[in-house]
């Protein structure tokens, strides 16, 4: 039975709803709707000019309506009179096929048709920086190896604990928070869930972290590589596939190598097969490739892959199998669109299951030290343009995510690359002025 948002508002004391959708570039767009008007919005959606956000639309297109999904409503723990609700984009009474949440829902349904239920957990890393974005906010956070630094995390206790308390209140079951490998960097973990719910939570988490940071006079950034020489922001994703009831893990086989079943290996095989094209979505910005192709950081490791390899419990590879019944994709970064991340994982994984793809040999080596000895594993794209070209060549992935989505994404991202190439940098000035 669909939750009535008007009733929800009366029972919870909600005065306003943020009807929110995510555009192709991961931007979160919303309208603040008074509770008195939510009944009409729940029926027909809140109207937007789609061209004003990152979609391949024109000013001549009719209104884009964001139809709230009442099952995804979240009352803001820090502002109880407001509730956030994820929305699906429609136009002329039909789903907008290029909208990320629409794309994900289609792939979740496809997996269900094959008796599969994808569950995932994400690990979005972020920096707490100065309001102007120029430096790390904690001037004492200067250690060469700051990971798990207890003094540093306690200096940011007020921010981290407040966010964690809110996740506890929301029933997300958070289980750990830590200072990460870069100065000023943090990670907060909560329990895995169905792919769509994970995407909704991921989207809300970014909104919540930024909001609470601002409340404390700080700024939070999920930018993949905000500071030269420091470890970048990853968004590792743990993946498992279950039966439709969510009771039997189809990836688990304690007798198999790494505890990964044949079906799990096939799903992983799809990820490996499509990895270079995946990067166009999992690493969607120019800056993303400063993380996955970075030189050694001050702390000693980038903690990011640069080759298409997998292994057991070893964090130097693109895919890690830390235990039976799941694997971790370490490729995505903090700029990834929460919905497209889940969508492209399902698309690639289903491709592997259908074709019984083999993930290939695994390498039990330190890729940071000995990766140069591996000659039969593809390198990940060197830049956004290379990744877009890989996606453009991957007909199977384009078909799986939808031709309308793929065309729109490639067009807008190519435009972003062209804009980047038109920039005149200080490096050019310094290195070329006197030639």
Curated annotation (Swiss-Prot):
**What does the record note on temperature and activity?**
Optimum temperature is 50 degrees Celsius.
Q: Does the keyword ATP-binding apply?
A: yes
In the record, biological process GO terms are: glutamine biosynthetic process; nitrogen fixation
Q: Which residues form the GS beta-grasp domain?
A: 12-94
How might one describe the regulation of this protein's activity?
Inhibited by methionine sulfoximine, ADP and pyrophosphate, but not by various nitrogen-containing metabolites that inhibit other GS enzymes.
- Gene Ontology molecular function, alphabetical: ATP binding; glutamine synthetase activity; metal ion binding
SMART domains documented for this protein: Gln-synt_C
Query: Binding of Mg(2+) 2: at which residues?
Result: 125, 180, 187
**What is this enzyme's EC?**
6.3.1.2
The superkingdom of the source organism is Bacteria
Swiss-Prot/TrEMBL catalytic activity: L-glutamate + NH4(+) + ATP = L-glutamine + ADP + phosphate + H(+)
Cofactor comment text: Binds 2 Mg(2+) ions per subunit.
Q: Which InterPro entries match?
A: Gln_synt_N (IPR008147), Gln_synt_N_sf (IPR036651), Gln_synth/guanido_kin_cat_dom (IPR014746), Gln_synth_cat_dom (IPR008146), Gln_synth_gly_rich_site (IPR027303), Glutamine_synthetase_typeIII (IPR017536)
Q: State the NCBIfam families in the record.
A: gln_synth_III
Report the function annotation for this chain: Catalyzes the ATP-dependent biosynthesis of glutamine from glutamate and ammonia.
Quaternary state and interactors: Homooctamer.
Beyond the main fields, what else does the record say? Can grow, in the absence of GSI and GSII glutamine synthetases, without a glutamine supplement in minimal medium that contains both ammonium and glutamate. However, given the high glutamate and ammonium substrate Km values, glutamine synthase is probably a secondary activity of GlnT.
Q: Which family does it belong to?
A: Belongs to the glutamine synthetase family.
Q: Which PANTHER family match?
A: GAMMA-GLUTAMYLPUTRESCINE SYNTHETASE (PTHR43785), GLUTAMINE SYNTHETASE (PTHR43785:SF14)
Q: What name appears for this protein in its UniProt entry?
A: Glutamine synthetase
Recorded source organism is: Rhizobium meliloti (strain 1021) (Ensifer meliloti)
Per the UniProt record, the lineage of the source organism begins with: Bacteria, Pseudomonadati, Pseudomonadota, Alphaproteobacteria, Hyphomicrobiales
